[in-house]
């Protein structure tokens, strides 16, 4: 078997459903298996997914064991030459799956590969490639220097934005949202460190792969990852959890550094955590309703009718345009010359009318200002955006 896809799920059944649908398209020519470990979800994930995807191997945990242990449970059963650690809130493409396999087949020194992750507005997610968080690199990241000087090879090394994102490059740290690992390399390094409950485990594994003499690569192959939109990285909870993981990594791999060197790191960690906490208090005092979306909807007549009902209910003050089309009739989608994007902020694609690969390609090549992506399927009857899932069945019952 060539590939084992491993997904850890926790209460995101609709995003997972879409991820699995994209995998069906992406792996049709690859011998593979898909293993989903459910961390005791309470949203009915088990019943919902297993009835729709009977070929997926479903492992239901009795409690939330965290991301690392969830993946390790699947690693122990995986049979593929390559292992793809994949987040459920992603859309993958045939280009990404087959491109990574082809690259690793021809580069035997590659331990793991990462890809070009898109945000829902089509922009590049900087966490697609990262450098090892050495004491200095970590300090620059946590103090904000890397944000002030993103292109600097000295201060902005964490996200490596000085590298050409359209070219394959050796990097150090690969995101656990999409990490294709050589099974042989994982056997040599050992599985994920379960002390990392959430965040940091991908950094630790990437580093251990490098220490075994392998190389890690970034490949300019597109996938979409919703996390960049749906996770507020300025909240106290996120900052505390993430930087606590950084502390664990620092203690594990740089314990030989003196207290005087580690002190600035800890100051930066807690400084960012305090700022996030204070900022969060101000945000809670001034909660504003999100403005209505202005949508271009492209798809079949059936999908247009259903999405129209959802938008009339949820974004009734927005301006919406509906275009009956598919990939064969209108391959340029929302980028067609006949469509003006000036008044719109969101494009909704019918995933039965356009392949996921085409949707991401169009999203990534949008000229001028960015358009946020939403998807709809008449099979699931769910409108999925970066921050919400709208159920047509709920809307139709209210009518």
For the regions a protein language model found, what residue spans apply to each?
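Short, acidic, metal-binding catalytic loop of nucleotide-sugar glycosyltransferases
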Residues: 21-31, 314-315
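Glycine-rich, basic loop-to-helix element that forms the pyrophosphate-binding segment
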Residues: 60-78, 99
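Short aromatic/hydrophobic "clamp" motif used to bind/position activated sugar donors
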Residues: 83
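Conserved donor NDP-sugar-binding/catalytic core segment of glycosyltransferases
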Residues: 91-127
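Short, flexible, basic/aromatic active-site loop/helix in glycosyltransferases
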Residues: 132-171
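Active-site-adjacent helix/loop segment of glycosyltransferases
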Residues: 207-282
